Amino acid sequence: EAAATAGVGPMAAVAGAIAEYIGRRLKTEYDCREVIVENGGDIYADIVEGMDIPVFAGQSPLSEKVGIFIPEGGRISICTSSGTVGPSLSFGMADAVMIVCSDAALADSYATAFANKIHTKQDINNVIAEIRKIPAISGAICIKDDMFGICGEYGLKIWKQPLIR
């Protein structure tokens, strides 16, 4: 259903759906206060406080230097797709498209759909405009080479040095 909504094949929703399923089971079966499950760039989180989310974008000079701040706790899904990083099939060349939704399968599907639409950095503005029209998406970052676009309800975070390495 999520993949059909985003206009992609059903496999585009699998990693996000699995992350959310595992996260919800951990939370209920083990009475965890907080849960964060990461599955190949797709995150399901049920958190008490806010958190920073940097974006890994491969060889882009913006990789791990831009991201968002989730200001408060709750259930959230953050999924990323790329045409230049990792083994997954992509019809685009985005270094990273990160989508934030309440539903992980939907976030995963939309990340794939919008990553497929970015071939050059000139595509970013049109993709961001398209993302803004979708009420289910609460935030997004698109990265290609040295350019990025952001939209949604979360604040932009910038780091001088990559956080991960």
Give the predicted meaning of each segment:
Residues 1-3, 8, 12-22, 32-127, ...:
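Conserved mixed alpha/beta catalytic, RNA-binding, or beta-rich assembly cores of soluble enzyme
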Residues 33-34, 121-151:
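Flexible, glycine/charged-enriched surface loops at secondary-structure junctions
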